Amino acid sequence: MLEGPILAVSRQTSLTSGIPGATKRYSFAKIKEPIEVPGLLDLQRDSFAWLIGAPEWRAKKQAESEEGARITSGLEDILEELSPIEDYSGNMSLTLSEPRFDDVKNTIDEAKDKDINYSAPLYVTAEFTNAMSGEIKSQTVFIGDFPMMTDKGTFIINGTERVIVSQLVRSPGVYFDESIDKSTERPLHSVKVIPSRGAWLEFDIDKRDTVGVRIDRKRRQPVTVLLKALGLSTQDITDRFGFSELMMSTLEHDGVANTDEALLEIYRKQRPGESPTRDSAQALLDNSFFNPKRYDLAKVGRYKVNRKLGLGGGSTTGEHTLTEEDILTTIEYLVRLHAGERTMESPDGTELMIATDDIDHFGNRRLRTVGELVQNQVRVGLSRMERVVRERMTTQDAESITPTSLINVRPVSAAIREFFGTSQLSQFMDQNNSLSGLTHKRRLSALGPGGLSRERAGLDVRDVHASHYGRMCPIETPEGPNIGLIGSLASYARVNPFGFIETPYRRVENGQATDVVDYLTADEEDRHIVAQANTKMDSEGRFVEDTVEVRMKGGNVEVVPASEVDYMDVSPRQMVSVATAMIPFLEHDDANRALMGANMQRQAVPLLRNEAPFVGTGMELRAAHDAGDVVIARRSGVVETVCADFITTLGDDGQRDTFLLRKFERTNQGTCYNQKPLVEAGDRIEEGQALADGPGTENGEMALGRNLLVAFMPWEGHNYEDAIILNQRIVEEDVLTSIHIEEHEIDARDTKLGPEEITRDIPNASEDILADLDERGIVRIGADVRDGDILVGKVTPKGETELTPEERLLRAIFGEKAREVRDTSMKVPHGETGKVIGVRVFSREDDDDLAPGVNQMVRVYVAQKRKIQDGDKLSGRHGNKGVVGKILPAEDMPFLPDGTPVDVILNTHGVPRRMNIGQVLELHLGMLAKSGWKVDPESQDPAIKAMLETLPEDLYDVPADSRVATPVFDGTTNEELSGLMRSSRPNRDGDQMVNEFGKSTLIDGRTGEPFQQPISVGYMYMLKLHHLVDEKIHARSTGPYSMITQQPLGGKAQFGGQRFGEMEVWAMQAYGAAYTLQELLTIKSDDVVGRVKVYEAIVKGDNIPDPGIPESFKVLLKELQSLCLNVEVLSADGTPVDLGADDDDLDQANASLGINLSRDERFDADAV
């Protein structure tokens, strides 16, 4: 059942660094990495495969586990947990088991087109047992359509691609805390037992040295009351806690003599106002902590409790509810902690370290991945269904009951639908480019249901923690209110079955690094001594030096003998995320700027022609392959057919594969998704080779921007404050041109007055306006359109009015044709232009699935080619962002001695105070990659001799126009850069364009004179960001007004006006511009009568009349009158002013001019 496209996910092979057909990159890396970066989408794929129990997941688990071990999927776990559902008498029961899926209903493309879910039907086996008659009835029950994950780790919900973000939450377990009492300055200790589901149990020691307990955050009571309620006698408590004066003192003053009194006391505190009985008190306590239906520690909670308290040998098995031993050991641990003891004997007889817990440590925070989040929703739905089943068992005739008659699947499907559609963790996928999609799927969020809220989250939880190392990136996080609450999974990290993030380390034995790699959680890592990846080693992996810099518990760096080291990092980039690992010379950038660089790479728009960076980090290839936008060969073989739409390959095993390419599709962010073939018919291909490029990739490598020739210099003040000066060539040759696609949708509905109609027959529309519409009234593909042009003609019936004799005659002659309709056509929104590239028509007549009341729906796709222009935002990869301030003709740009004009001029002031020196080093290395270099190993130059100590041999001779890689924390050194600049290849004239410092004497394009000082020139990778001026610039003539205040609306989306605010008014007052100020406050704003009279005066050529009373003044009066204040307006001579007197004039003026300027916000901006 689970074959086919449901889990195309699991069939993807893991990619190695030796990807066939890839562009050669000359890498400066010195460190050999023992393992590859794991699959970058495994976080999503593996979790969902566990949830649905995919065959590949089962096979993998069986291979890893002991023979005969039972393997259950996420859905099977829930059904086991829920079953059996018994009626109140226990005579009838219903058991659910064996969840299974049919094939998916629609393909991914069909789901997107029809605005439906990409899902598969879920069935379970339901077995009803009647204990009285011994009868068993079994049926297969349809539970609902279950959204399935695509091969890219996304979901298609209502036609849009969404991502379920993994949630970082506090793990269930037992947590000890220390606080300082403000009055006595003594340390006070407390402990919380936090379950996955159920009531919290808290113990604390207060300043009066009594041990108390809070159940479910209610009132505090002596801990011995709880112990007696659990059935312990005073003697039992004395035997267990006789060593503690605190416990003995608490026992003495607890005021209860036996178990019954203790139970009643707890009931009174928990349920004040209710009369307690012993049975109800016992039931309350049992349900709170010992009933699996009400209280659940989960596997991870039991694991954490056992590890912390030394129970069960630290195993993961055991009850998922609390046990008496759990409670006793927790109290003992607390009193010993308060007494200042450092160790205690655990119930297992082992020695247990006593310490408080750090709640921000990654040993105490775990991930809820997509599988667990969906599983929790299914659990919620099933528990609602359970109540319905119980009720039906009692109301239906026992003889006629069948499983299908008991089960109502609506609560389950509703819970799943609600989660995927509206949950804070189900997010509209960021498809701006390949990297943004990949990063979105690897995002970790501490927000969401059961997590933190940004208002309550303090600095501690947002801060970088030592345990984040190799697990969560310390760089990549948003800049706004979510800073530190949303992170990104580190490149080598993976998630273990308990949800804790693990990172790999090389095992070190007797000072020698082996190739054995262990994945450690943050807790396990704290028990070991870990060396850095760049620790100096000989060819056999032995540490060269006797002492090594290592990381100890808490992130402290110390120097220890080499023989004491347990592990070392597998790679220098294991601490950062994928996006951060793509910043060359990251080690030379300030963290704040690196954060901006990592975030802004995700905002880069795919360009018309993509170009991989000259200076990369080696991560570009792997990121592009794993993002899923590059088409990859499934098996080795030969290319049979290549065209723009598909590629066919014939494998060596005789199997034929067809790869459909996606052409000019719109992404969620309006960028263009287009795939282009890289191979030709007859080419030999290998498994894993890139067959076609996606958006923002070149030859299978991530390519988000262009390599441009950059000079660092001020230029006439035009690049002041991060402004950027561009060469006109960039515009003319479409170097930074991108395609943006907008989708416009309109539907024809049934209205009370009759059906709307999509038609070419539009009232009062000339043939010129209709020229590009076809006979159906829909714009033709290929038409160039601009704002205000009709895309789809539509008429809506008007309300019938009294007909004139002439109209009655027309109605009699032409029948219904002359009926009153109004034009409700879909027009191109204000400020948009482009070319129509696609039209989709959905009609009820063609059996398309449309919403109720909709007869026809039309989607029109308009593509726009946007060249770079003044006001667009550009950025490098080091947080060096800026706005295009001026585009100069190529002849005015400064040029190199060989006549090459520079493409970009950046201001030097943007470097020193921001401390992102990486951009300057990238500039120099980019120039070297462009020119190539040849190193003379025999050279006596000190700079070259220093370089040869570290430079890999395969980098001695590099041709021009090469691609280089400088991995983060393991890249080009300053000595290497300095030596290579002395070894760069001359151009064809035999000249070297830059000197040994990477500088060149530039010549002013306007005067032909050289600039006074040499200037740093080189190639930098520049990105065009999504903040385009075309989408921001806006101007209003007349438009919609707010219904209450009658002032113009604000914002481009509402076709609003520019707010002339309080501070601007002060400026007018300062200049004494009284008349301008009066106009702004009245006829240009909310003087409803005045603005119509002004229009009339302009039309008739009269003088502008005096302003009237602003509407907001009338609103203020009404507000005061609503507070029972009798406010009247008096004229200068003391006579009352009638504020409604002008309304009649207004109506007459409107009628005579045939205008309506008093629009309200219900009017659509497009209709203006």
UniProtKB/Swiss-Prot annotation:
Catalytic activity: RNA(n) + a ribonucleoside 5'-triphosphate = RNA(n+1) + diphosphate
Transcription listed as a keyword: yes
Pfam families, alphabetized: RNA_pol_Rpb2_1, RNA_pol_Rpb2_2, RNA_pol_Rpb2_3, RNA_pol_Rpb2_45, RNA_pol_Rpb2_6, RNA_pol_Rpb2_7
EC numbers, comma separated: 2.7.7.6
Annotated PROSITE patterns: RNA_POL_BETA (PS01166)
InterPro entries listed in its UniProt record: DNA-dir_RNA_pol_bsu_ext_1_sf, DNA-dir_RNA_pol_bsu_external_1, DNA-dir_RNA_pol_su2, DNA-dir_RNAP_su2_dom, DNA-dir_RNAP_su2_hyb_sf, RNA_pol_bsu_bac, RNA_pol_bsu_CS, RNA_pol_bsu_protrusion
SUPFAM superfamilies assigned to the protein according to its UniProt record, in alphabetical order: beta and beta-prime subunits of DNA dependent RNA-polymerase
NCBIfam families, per the entry: PRK00405.1, rpoB
Stated family: Belongs to the RNA polymerase beta chain family.
Protein's UniProt name: DNA-directed RNA polymerase subunit beta
Organism: Corynebacterium kroppenstedtii (strain DSM 44385 / JCM 11950 / CIP 105744 / CCUG 35717)
Gene name of the encoded protein: rpoB
